[in-house]
Amino acid sequence: MKAVVRRVAYCIVLLVCIMYVSIGLFIYMPGISKGNVKQKTDSVEPVRPLFDHLDVLKKLRVDYVLEKAKEAGTAEIGSKPYWRWSPVGQVVDSQFRDSNTVLSVMPSVVENGGSVTLEWKNIPDPSPRTRSSDWIALFCPSSSPSNRYIDYWSVSDLATDYPSSSGSVNLILYNVRTDCEFRYFTNDTYVELLAVSNKVTFVDSTEAPLHGHLALTGDASQMRVQWTTGVQYTPTVDYGLCGSELDNTSKGTSRTYKNSDMCGPPANLSAHFIEPGYLHDVLLTGLKPNTRYCYRYGSPGFKYSSEQNFTSAIEPGSDIPFKFVMYGDMDTTLPPGSITTAALVKKEIEENGVTMLIHIGDLSYAIGLAYRWEMWMSLIEPYSVLAPYMIGIGNHEQEHIVGGEKDPSHAPGNGFHPSWGNYGHDSGGECGVPVYNRFHMPENGNQPWWYSFEYGLVHFTVLSTEHNFTQGSPQHTWLRNELSSVDRSRTPWLIVSCHRAMYSSEQYFVDNQVGEHIRHALEPIFHEYRVDLVVVGHYHTYERTCKVYREQCVEDGTIHVLVGGAGFILDSAPVLPFRWSKHFELEFGYGRVTVANKTALLWEFVRNRDRKVTDSVWLYH
């Protein structure tokens, strides 16, 4: 009898497992973001034209995106939540209802990132049925037509006493270098505009130097300073040793971009685009390595920033110990996500001696909604002006399916779309344009997509897994030449970062399949040139492997660290117990690296919610 029971139990468990896998295969179909499942292959398949291998579901999603591009005001909106469409179909001819509704915002003048109180009164018929379709939109400039709002909120999400004829909420506003106003809409039977708020302006609206950040060039005597204003001028940085006069001056260049510069919808539509202002870029030269400098940026006759400071780079080969931070997949989420990450990394710089950081792709999650770039750049500014903010490219900066001729990375066709992957439309048509114009990385590859630099005892190599990385591709050829030229007597530590992971215990089927192809293409090179550490993101979690090669723990392998929990929604996929996985946790946090000397390096994972180090490993030569 017991044997029969065991057999029945075994069959039930087997049936449940089969159902679970079947459901998983259905859930992670393309268009949801995890792609189509194909059999593992022993070789990397050549890249094909996109439409040669799209299955029916992905083709339908592509058609839907292209159809939306033809409609005014129906662009896909960022992550509110992830890839949510605008609250109504078209907001073109909204009627103004003659009502007593009042919408007001206070104060009417606000700093960048300042809080305002938005209040509404006398909403007609405040019942759940009629008010469930109410929404409030932000328009900048205030003269924008009703189909050109830059952000929106459902009233049911904002109001604590919903439904009611009145309500209020505190919101953070970001300086978009023009005036703004809010409008209250209802969409019960058709779109009606119930009320328009007073106008809001920003302190030093167009002159305010915004979004300041630093970048290394690979030369310890240099530092790059970048920022944004609403006015065009000769960008100027005054700098000097802290404690003395800022008696050195460097001038630079400026650039900007338009919605028409981007590859596809919604990014290239006018409906949710904000003029990014003038993006200024100044190179500081003649710096002493590993020295504290103070600086300010602006232009004579215009407003300057407050005085900031940074520590210049450590000269390559110097055995001075240093610390840096690495993370991926940030966004602008509430604690313990992005906002906590930003606050803790600022403390790392100010209190713990961190002098540099690397963001491994998926930066703002704007996905075509320009206002999210304003939000995210403002979030990182308090610490990106204190230490170089080096970046890599993720799928949400780069992936596109149309308009490839506008891709500033000059990827052929409409980008990288291998038949075995889930490369699609994840940038919302941005195709790298915002990040290319906002961040200037070292110019020894195809920056900001792939490049390298040296800092002290470490050689850093940054790759793009959103571009062709297979054998024979320009990036693959560059990588081999790049790693073969590293002088390990000068920079004994070799660290590679890219967005997508080779190793993950999470069961996102096609992302895992992509990882297998990355392993096939890149792992032999990493093993040949004895890469010490590979740091990645994409999966929104934390995981560390053993020294691994070809899925086996070996003494001469490479440690892979997945640190994709800087802020975006944490993953929820099942996790399998692979032998190469040494630590896994579903937590927000970031990586901290201490380069002690030529023979010892410490990796630590710092958990956001309590700032505890929950995983660490020493690497030795």
Functional labels for PLM-detected ranges:
Residues F202, T206-P574, W580-E585, R592-H621:
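Metal-dependent phosphoester/phosphodiester hydrolase catalytic core
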Residues K2-P126, T130-G328, E350-E351, L586, ...:
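Acidic, histidine-bearing metal-coordination/catalytic regions of metal-dependent phosphoesterases
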